[in-house]
Amino acid sequence: LAMVSSHFHLGSSPPLLAMILRPSTGESERHTLHNLLETRCWSLNGFSLDHAAQAHQTSAPYPKDQSEFDACGFDAEWLDEFGAPFIKGSPLQIGCLLREHHPLEINGTHMIIGEVQHLQYPVTAQRDDGGLSLSDMGLVAVIGLDTYTQPHAGLRFAPAETTSPPQPL
């Protein structure tokens, strides 16, 4: 279990998410990359502002044999068809299978690309267009390494066209 603030959408067909993992340098051991390469899967779990302190604590450098679930007060939820645990009760649970691993020479980080295999969310969070409303799930967004905020709907636009101005949705 680790706090990763750098997940991003990479494609829809197949559904892909990517993330950047920090390098294993200095005195801090980093087990996330090793675990991902070994198990070839991971879960992405949304959390509310009420759980931000617990989630932030997962970024502490725990020893390899220490469960961050136990140390940070989360309960693990295992699904029969998936090889990584989810956070029990998380309103947004995404399970990814490792598809590509790219070490980045520029700064020693690693880009991990996964294909979404499991997606669970409250049906009330699905918008009419099929997208998900993070604010309806009460989820937080992470800014940088240490700031947690709640998103709101903001502005949405139809796909841009060269022949017309932006069209609000």
Residue positions per predicted region:
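Basic, polyanion-binding surface patches
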Residues: L1-L169
